[in-house]
A protein has these predicted regions:
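Short coil/turn segments at secondary-structure boundaries
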Residues: 19-20, 67-68, 91-92, 127-129, ...
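Acidic catalytic/metal-coordinating carboxylates
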Residues: 35-39, 193-201
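Output/docking surface of receiver
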Residues: 7-9, 31, 54-122, 139, ...
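Residue-level detector of conserved catalytic or cofactor/ligand-binding positions
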Residues: 202-210
Length: 210
C-alpha cells in the first residue's frame, strides 16, 4: 500500500500526533513558526529515538555551513529539496531498504547497490534517478511472474540501495553485505577521518577488492 502523509506546522503539533498515532518516518521541513528545523528534529528524536528522521531543506551556502558544523547524530539523513517530487519516494525507499536489507539479504539473497557520496545536493538528485531505474527494471522482471504472489516476491527481491556519506560508513556497509554486493557507485573524493580526502575512492577500493 502507498504511504500516507500527515502534515503539521509546528513542533508541538508533531509531538501531539506522535503521542497519539504510530509513524514510521518523520520528515522535517522549514515551517511557518521559524523554529530551527535541526533543533526541532533533535528534540523529537529525544522522545522517539526509534523513528527515522529526515531533514528536507532548500539548499544554500548558509545551510551548507550549518550542516558542516552541526551535530547531526539525531538526524538519519539530510536531503536538499530540488523541486522533484520523486525525491519523496526515494527517501521512503531508502528508509525501507535500510530496515529490510539485513533480513532480505539473509533470507532470500537480495543484492545491494552502494552509493558513496557526501554531497547532499548530489545524492538528493541522484537517488530518485537510481531508484526509478531499479524499480522499472524490477517491474519488467515481475511481469514475467505467473501469479500475483510471484510478482510480489520478485518486486521484494529487487536490489536494495544503501547510502554511505563517509569512507568509514562505506566500509562498514560493504563489510556487512560483502557477499551480496552488486556494485558500488562512488564519487572520487569524500569524507575520510573527518576531512575531505581527494583519494577516498582509491582508499575504499582496497578493502573492497577480493
Amino acid at each position: 500500500y502507498p504511504p500516507r502523509f500527515t502534515q503539521v506546522t509546528t513542533e508541538e503539533e508533531a509531538l501531539n500526533e506522535l503521542k497519539n498515532r504510530n509513524f514510521e518516518l518523520i520528515i522535517c521541513m522549514p515551517n511557518m513558526d521559524n523554529r530551527d528545523i535541526f533543533a526541532a528534529a533533535t528534540e523529537i528524536k529525544i522522545h522517539y529515538p526509534n523513528i527515522p528522521i529526515v531533514v528536507l531543506t532548500p539548499f544554500s551556502k548558509e545551510v551548507s555551513k550549518r550542516i558542516a558544523n552541526e551535530d547531526l547524530s539525531a538526524i538519519d539523513y539530510v536531503f536538499s529539496w530540488l523541486g522533484n517530487a520523486e525525491l519523496l519516494l526515494a527517501i521512503i525507499k531508502l528508509i525501507e531498504d535500510k530496515m529490510n536489507a539485513p533480513d532480505d539479504t539473509a533470507s532470500v539473497g537480495v543484492q545491494i547497490i552502494l552509493l558513496v557520496e557526501d554531497s547532499v545536493r548530489f545524492y538528493s538528485s541522484a537517488l530518485p534517478h537510481l531508484y526509478k531505474f531499479v524499480l522499472e527494471q524490477s517491474q519488467m522482471f515481475a511481469k514475467e511472474a505467473l501469479n500475483d504472489h510471484q510478482r510480489t516476491l520478485r518486486m521484494r527481491g529487487r536490489p536494495k540501495i544503501k547510502l554511505a556519506r563517509t569512507y568509514e560508513e562505506a566500509v562498514r556497509i560493504f563489510n556487512q553485505y560483502r557477499d551480496n554486493m552488486l556494485g558500488i557507485i562512488s564519487d572520487m573524493s569524500f569524507m575520510h577521518d573527518g576531512v575531505k580526502d581527494p583519494l577516498s575512492l582509491i582508499h575504499i577500493s582496497e578493502p573492497t577488492r577480493p
